[in-house]
């Protein structure tokens, strides 16, 4: 059972662990979404993992019990063509053929895809249709400015095709990025796209345990208790393990992890 912010403010994690942890009836399963094949090499190797590298790792990754395996965002289509001289769609097909029972994820970036231009609706729609046709059954979308107009069509179409969908809330530190902003954006995502789950996306590694104390309950209040909520962060400050512990205490359902390539 998730703690309220008031409970967290009066009971530290050290006190919880010293007492032997939570009572048995408060235990929850926290699921793991692996990002080794997508974000790990994107962040450390500039997305230079080749198809042969992925295929070598595939058995271990797909048999580890992860809820989903993150495989591509638009940059995983750009780099193979530009630098590796590989066909990214062929990579996607090979991976799905080798592990047909694994839920691989794809993510769509705003209205840009793999470019820096705003693309027309028919191009966005064709991209989403090709993702689904090539095996993806979990499709999400994000916009760096949390402009839901830029991702709503993607999520609606993906769901119409039969995919499980996730909408991202991009995290940032600024006077604008208040709890209320995330409440408003989460509600808009759910109301406009009927999304299947929400991801708090912290690509900059800026989340802290203290920030989670109000942010996660705020988002949860907006989306209800039944819609899965996941957190994606990076360990640039070294705080991500503790941030994830607080996320679990506060009611997050899934966390994103990876290993170095």
Walk through the language-model features, giving the residues of each.
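Generic hydrophobic/aromatic pocket-lining and core-packing "Φ" positions
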Residues: 58, 92, 128, 155, ...
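Secondary-structure transition/capping motifs at alpha-helix termini
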Residues: 100-102, 160-164, 191-196, 220-227, ...
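Catalytic alpha/beta core domains of metabolic enzymes, predominantly
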Residues: 203-261
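Structural recognition of alpha->loop->beta junctions
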Residues: 59-67, 125-137, 183-201, 246-255
């Amino acid at each position: 059972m998730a703690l309220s912010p008031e409970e967290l403010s009066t009971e530290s994690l050290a006190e919880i662990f010293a007492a032997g942890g939570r009572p048995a009836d408060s235990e929850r399963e926290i699921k793991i979404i692996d990002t080794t094949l997508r974000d790990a090499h994107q962040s450390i190797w500039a997305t230079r993992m080749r198809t042969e590298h992925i295929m070598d790792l595939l058995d271990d990754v797909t048999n580890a019990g992860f809820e989903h395996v993150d495989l591509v965002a638009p940059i995983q289509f750009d780099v193979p063509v530009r630098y590796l001289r590989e066909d990214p769609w062929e990579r996607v097909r090979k991976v799905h053929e080798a592990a047909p029972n694994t839920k691989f994820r794809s993510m769509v970036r705003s209205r840009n895809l793999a470019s820096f231009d705003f693309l027309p609706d028919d191009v966005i729609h064709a991209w989403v249709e090709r993702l689904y046709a090539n095996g993806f059954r979990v499709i999400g979308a994000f916009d760096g400015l949390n402009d839901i107009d830029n991702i709503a069509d993607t999520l609606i179409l993906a769901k119409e095709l039969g995919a499980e969908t996730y909408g991202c809330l991009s995290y940032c530190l600024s006077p604008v990025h208040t709890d209320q902003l995330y409440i408003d954006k989460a509600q808009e995502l759910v109301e406009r796209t009927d999304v299947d789950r929400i991801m708090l996306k912290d690509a900059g590694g800026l989340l802290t345990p203290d920030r989670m104390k109000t942010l996660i309950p705020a988002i949860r209040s907006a989306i209800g208790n039944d819609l899965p909520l996941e957190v994606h962060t990076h360990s640039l400050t070294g705080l991500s393990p503790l941030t994830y512990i607080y996320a679990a205490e506060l009611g997050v359902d899934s966390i994103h992890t990876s290993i170095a390539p």
